[in-house]
Amino acid sequence: MPLQSSLPLDGSDSPAAMAGRLALPVPDGHLDELRLPDGTLRAPWARFFSELGEQGDLGNLSPDALAARAAAVARQIRDNGVTYNVYADQGGGARAWQLELLPFLIAEEDWAVIERGAAQRATLANAIMADIYGPQTLLTRGLLPPGLVYGHPGYMRPLKGYQPPGGSFLQTMAIDLVHTDDGWTVIAHRTETPSGMGYALENRLIISGQFADAFREMRVRRLPPAFAQLISTLAHAPLVAGADEGTSLPSSGGLHIVLLSPGPFNETYFEHTFLARYLGITLVEGRDLTVRNDMVYLKTFGGLERVDVILRRLDDVFCDPLELRSDSTIGVPGLLEAMRAGNVMVSNVPGAGFLESPAIHGFLPGIARALLDERLILPAVSSWWCGEAAAQDEAMSTLTEAFVMPTYPRVPGEPRLGMERGLQPLEDWRARIAETPDRYTLQAPLPLSHTPCWEPDGRGGGRIGSRASMLRVFAIADGNGGWQVMPGGFMRLAPPRLDAVSMQLGGTSADTWVLSSQTSGAVPLAARSGLAAAPDDWLESTQVSALVPPSCIDTASSRGGASLMNPPGMTCQPPLPSAMANTRSMAAREPMRPPPRPSGSQHGVCESGSGACSV
């Protein structure tokens, strides 16, 4: 049961003092993100609550005022059509996005450690990819077991010897972190199709509007530079490759970047549409693309258009049914051959999912010393791959307390604690591990920190509670061998009374504020990324070929685009989220244009120095 407290209506006390005095302790053994061990508020939170009172955002922080703000957040999410697909939900899957009212605060000095550690791990991950798909010195030197590499279904043998455009296998990487009394600890890498950047931006757009004065006064670092870096990196690598290697990249008429999505039933489909719109790139599915003469083309109403860069949100094994999973109906036949020919850049390179295996954590300290001559800044959770006899013996002694994790990708399902596996006897687990030890990795449990959150009571009021939390941060390659870490992240909170953090289990998210001593400039994405300003006649159209039946499409041939049309008495199926309304159509003929310039801070566009920018 999460511990909670009510905020009083007494305006004679300072908001910071009220919160610090009356908030109840978090469960024993868990770090309290709100307060220090002596009961006083941590500096970022003391400043946050003080700013609310002084600036008048919420008056004296009455439950009624907070409840009204929370209701406004829920209403804006509903109006924006922000959703998340839950596979286990038999009621249709798509649920409204769950966003906490209170942001998660990170002090400048704490973020500096996270930033350096995340950039280091991204550098290391890219170096590992270059090695296992290249000379494989890590295997010959005994730093990585060959059985772990070759036995992993995420290792793509067809790409052995592949050299990606620009030389980088990874352009984005997400890292999941847990905060304990000892600092921040890495528990997972997300390199296959790292999700969350779009949701983090949507969270920022909403929450910064609820606390506009505090957001400005606390000098929260902005998110758009990370997205500008992403689009710059995607655009730069093919240009470098074409110049240095003599390939046919880029296509004539301008660079064409697409976001490859599995489709509307994917759990993070809203994010795919949101990112495509925000970055000004084409949202496509596998059936929208074709390979001709080792080149990738987009099917449009006006004919085939060359594709230079694919930002994929499609799992590795589904990318190419000719060379990977033959039963894939969402991939692009011939994609790997086009990659090997140097005619298309795919980000991240298929095969990057290997780095997500929990078994790799135990080998990374040695690999970091060998490849980077560095110690890891951010430690990882203690892990034992049972495929090694010595590690298996040590791991089995911790089976009653450890998490049993699948070494390789698996069907949906949560890892379970050894002593809480229900009806299956512990000896059965020992037998299963002994039979196929390489399939299992044991990890030591970590107590998740508890983050403050607003919990409405259903009667127009509520309380401040706390929930177990986990932070995901994002690193973006800068095209020159370095990495930029998005100043913020994707904070996830566990459902009430649970310690497992999972959006599939009904968890929530929180905006993440990285505080700064410097004033952040406010510049639109287009200006930062070097993209041209959006023209007045920008086509507000939607990606249509695979999602909307022909009867729902009004072809605007004179303008080179298509717009969504709902004929009277007819509903398009499957329905499109509202964020699709301005996503570039397959038929749009202007590659690399930014999306329409929206009005107001809700869309993160502002004039420099105006103070209205929310991101």
Q: How would you name each of these model-derived features?
A:
Residues 549, 574-578:
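N-terminal helix-forming leader/targeting segments
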Residues 1-566, 584-587, 592, 600-607, ...:
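Preference for protein termini
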